[in-house]
Swiss-Prot record:
Source organism phylogeny: Bacteria, Bacillati, Actinomycetota, Actinomycetes, Mycobacteriales
InterPro entries: DUF1398, YdfO-like_sf
A Pfam family per the record: DUF1398
Domain of life: Bacteria
Species per Swiss-Prot/TrEMBL record: Mycobacterium bovis (strain ATCC BAA-935 / AF2122/97)
Record's protein name: Uncharacterized protein Mb2035
Length: 164
């Protein structure tokens, strides 16, 4: 077990490494704030995705149940470690396309929070998913190369500057 001072040094070292990515992180966080503030409650994901795309995000990969997300951006990659959905050891659920589609439709209807959607996707056997913001697709991956892909609509971001 590391002493408290050694753990603190490691934490400071991590922050110093993160400081090198301040431009990518700052850009991503600003786009996320704008997208969250301006997205509609129903069918909000395409608005979120378009705001991120316009901010230079090309792909976004989520690993479930770790709730770890990698944003590949024009400014550099950014990793975001959220609060995991599980603690300890768990069996991996079988990939259930029907349950995944049900979770997607509930989220699209504004009936769930993002964390509730992620938990439902995990229970449907999703280990990771990739959002390709250029091609407007979300691909969900289970064990043994099981996949499900959806296209999402092109939209003008809500609350953004008007286009001429």
């Amino acid at each position: 077990m590391l002493s408290k001072s050694k753990r603190s040094c490691r934490r400071r070292e991590t922050l110093r490494i993160g400081e090198k990515m301040s431009a990518p992180i700052t850009n991503l966080q600003a786009a996320q704030r704008d997208a969250i503030m301006n997205r509609p409650a129903v069918n909000g994901f395409p608005h979120l995705a378009e705001t991120l795309r316009r901010a230079g995000v090309r792909t976004n990969t989520w690993w479930l149940p770790a709730m770890q997300s990698l944003y590949e951006t024009d400014y550099g990659p950014v990793l975001d470690q959220g609060v995991p959905l599980i603690d300890g050891v768990a069996e991996v659920p079988a990939f259930d396309r029907t349950a995944l589609v049900t979770a997607l439709r509930a989220d699209q209807a504004g009936q769930t929070s993002f964390r509730e959607f992620a938990a439902a996707a995990w229970r449907a056997g999703v280990l990771r998913y990739v959002v390709d913001l250029e091609n407007r697709t979300c691909t969900y991956f289970g064990l043994h190369d099981q996949t499900y892909m959806e296209h999402y609509a092109a939209v003008e971001p809500s609350g953004g500057a008007p286009t001429s």
